[in-house]
Amino acid sequence: LNERLSLQFHHGREMFSLQLKDFIKHMEQMMYELQHSDSSVKSLIAQHQDGQPRFEYAYHAYTKTKLKGSKSGDSYKIFSLTNQLVAILLSDGMGHSLKSNQESERIVTYMKQFMKYSIQPETAMHTLHYLYAFQNHDDMYATLDVGMIDLQEGKYYCWKAGCMSTYIVRKNEIFKLNSFSPPIGAMPQFYVEMGTHELKSNDMIFIVSDG
């Protein structure tokens, strides 16, 4: 019995050591990426105070399940951070089950709370990735598409992790914002893709998932 307990203790200590090393590596990588990120969006939320915006917006959300009676793995939230900033969150959990829906809903809920406390999207997404990766569940991951519309300057900012491309339609033109980054919690190496696009009156933004 003592030998078995000793082996279990040794195994637990080794696992803790590996997790601690992973945590340190993750934090170092996150700090490096934040230091080298685009300075024009690092303090975006903090820079915008309440005021009368120059532009107005309207939105429509459409969802459809793959099979009749199945549960969508997608979750989304659209909300105002200030009078000048509108946030859009879309997450796609793995599969078409209640669990996948719960995971994506948890992701967008946490992300909204981070942003409400003026935590920058890239920092929040790295934190969410660490939390999911640290749980060590191979089948637990979700995409995350974060968008912010600046109603004062007429700009669209996006941060993407494993999600589909975003399309901006302007009359006969279509602008595509691609994404090639991994989902949150899926792989040890994680990074966030960021983009900015100038907007004009009557532009339409399509933020989609693959279902």
Regions found by a protein language model. Name each.
Residues D38-M94, K99, E105-T109, T166, ...:
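N-terminal entry segment of metal-dependent catalytic domains or homologous docking segments
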Residues S72-T82, L144, L177-G211:
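Acidic loop->beta-strand submotif enriched in PP2C/PPM serine/threonine phosphatases
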Residues V86-L89, C158, I205-V208:
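Short hydrophobic-aromatic micro-motifs
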Residues H36, S43-Q49, P53, N101-K171:
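Catalytic core of PPM/PP2C metal-dependent serine/threonine phosphatase domains
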Residues D92, C163, I207-G211:
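DG-centered beta-turn motif at the end of beta-strands
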Residues K64-S70, F134-D138, G185-Q189:
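Short, solvent-exposed secondary-structure boundary motifs
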Residues L1-F55, A87:
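Signal-transmission coiled-coils
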